[in-house]
Amino acid sequence: MTQLSPVAVSMGDPAGIGPEIILKAWQSWRRRNGVPPLIALGDIDAFTATAQALGLPAPCPLPTPTREAAETLDGLPVFDVGVKIAAPVRPGQPDTANAACTKAAIETGVRLALDGQVSALVTAPIAKSVMYEAGFAFPGHTEFLAELCADHPVDGPKGPAMMLAGGGLRVVLVTIHEPLVRALSLITPQRVEATARITDAALRRDFGIARPRLALAGLNPHAGEGGALGDEEIDILDPLAARLRADGIDITDAQPPDTLFHAEARAGYDAAICLYHDQGLIPVKTLDFHGGVNITLGLPIVRTSPDHGTAFNIAGQGVARPDSLLAALEQAVKIAECRA
């Protein structure tokens, strides 16, 4: 098997739980056999302050993002991203002055992944409102990553598409970070088709599933009940599913969302195509609140993230759990191995 280069983890918002869960995840990850080393991207001062406050092992500066360099260090390897924390980090109190360092960590991770210096990028949570105040022009990580990768070819349909996985369930969203009223207007045949094609290709390439089975969630109660409760299934979703099947993609007609996620139904598909954010995230987080993973499909790089936010309310208390970050690391390595 090909020996993978390190897996990079971007710092996230330094006032959130990102530095804490990265430090904790590294302690667990370094004891595992057969996995590439974890390296953190950001300002080492943020990690050092967190380690000192919580009694965790001190991080170490990483001069070069190589496997050999990372494996020689006795603390979390932190690769400098060229932008320092501009304001003192106060757990639970984000500062827009530090958004530039947060952004630089993501950009550095993408650059290293595109150059093949890291096998995958795992992103710790950012605070969208803080980033917006600092001039960040993207709805979230997913869209920003797509922009950074826009000039690079993809093996298959180009994304991005957001997959959430946990508890044996995979869902992929047609609309992502949109208010529900706006999301309804964005559920077009083109978007649904693109999401299904990206998902089918990713399940083959990144998950090793030779013949992926997709389930399509309906929009209306009871999937419209034959038009009695809405026409979107009849007019948009079912005809599109028929066209996709004619092209060799195994996808169901629109299914009632309220019966799509129980154990017996989940056994019949490899991923569910969900039309808006909460339709997909509620079942995943219900099944696996602490271990859910966000996976960006249709990029030239491997990117995953924990399926939770910055958790400012518990930052600095030492109680943040690294479970979802560890699951994101595991998933990133599996995908990187499939692509290797």
From Swiss-Prot:
It is found in: Cytoplasm. The keyword Cytoplasm applies. Homodimer. It catalyses: 4-(phosphooxy)-L-threonine + NAD(+) = 3-amino-2-oxopropyl phosphate + CO2 + NADH. The active site is located at the dimer interface. Its cofactor is Zn(2+); Mg(2+); Co(2+). The gene is pdxA. Belongs to the PdxA family. It is an enzyme of class 1 (oxidoreductase). Keywords: Cobalt, Cytoplasm, Magnesium, Metal-binding, NAD, NADP, Oxidoreductase, Pyridoxine biosynthesis, Zinc. Catalyzes the NAD(P)-dependent oxidation of 4-(phosphooxy)-L-threonine (HTP) into 2-amino-3-oxo-4-(phosphooxy)butyric acid which spontaneously decarboxylates to form 3-amino-2-oxopropyl phosphate (AHAP). Signal peptide: none annotated. GO terms for biological process: pyridoxal phosphate biosynthetic process; pyridoxine biosynthetic process. A divalent metal cation binds at residues 177, 222, 277. Binds 1 divalent metal cation per subunit. Can use ions such as Zn(2+), Mg(2+) or Co(2+). One of its GO terms (cellular component) is cytoplasm. GO terms for molecular function: 4-hydroxythreonine-4-phosphate dehydrogenase activity; cobalt ion binding; magnesium ion binding; NAD binding; zinc ion binding. Substrate binds at residues 141-142, 285, 294, 303. This is 4-hydroxythreonine-4-phosphate dehydrogenase. Pathway: Cofactor biosynthesis; pyridoxine 5'-phosphate biosynthesis; pyridoxine 5'-phosphate from D-erythrose 4-phosphate: step 4/5. Its EC number is 1.1.1.262.
